[in-house]
């Protein structure tokens, strides 16, 4: 029997005492912000959008509700002009973000974050940022996408790669 204790290390701090994240997002112009659930006598209210939350001007022009089946992953996609706000509202969603903008100070950097409605947050995605979402839970997952431009059916500002593309060095599994 081995009497040597297993190697250990102290966990690093990831949030402050009031549960704000320690580390910044790390990708230039991408914003991830927690919003508060407001519990009241008839249930829970969660604000999804306030203009003052955004440093860039963002006028909502189009809104979609997306449902992902368990284990499914959206295509990697980005926009040349359009800005997105992604707000998960149901289930467990892992969001991958990759900066493919060659002129960006954070070119080549990526982040992966997990979202669920118990601790609501949104992601602001500026033009040129690749993003994909994966349902990592056992039930359908849902998210709302707010766009600053209306969807152009004839000429969409959507540039896509398959979920498993090797061009994006991010894994959502």
What are these regions (language model features)?
Residues 1-119, 136-173:
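Non-catalytic, conserved peripheral segments adjacent to functional cores
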């Amino acid at each position: 029997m081995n009497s040597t204790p297993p190697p250990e290390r102290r966990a690093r701090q990831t949030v402050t005492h009031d549960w704000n994240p320690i580390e910044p997002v790390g990708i230039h112009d991408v914003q991830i912000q927690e919003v508060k659930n407001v519990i009241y006598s008839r249930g829970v209210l969660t604000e999804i959008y306030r203009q003052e939350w955004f440093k860039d001007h963002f006028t909502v022009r189009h809104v979609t509700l997306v449902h992902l089946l368990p284990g499914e992953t959206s295509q990697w996609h980005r926009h040349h002009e359009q800005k997105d706000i992604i707000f998960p509202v149901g289930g467990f969603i892992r969001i991958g973000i990759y900066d493919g903008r060659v002129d960006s100070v954070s070119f080549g950097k990526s982040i992966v974050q997990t979202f669920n409605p118990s601790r609501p947050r949104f992601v602001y995605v500026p033009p040129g940022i690749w993003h994909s979402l994966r349902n990592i839970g056992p039930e359908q997952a849902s998210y709302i996408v707010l766009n600053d431009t209306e969807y152009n059916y004839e000429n969409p500002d959507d540039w896509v790669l398959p979920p498993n593309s090797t061009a994006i060095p991010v894994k959502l599994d």
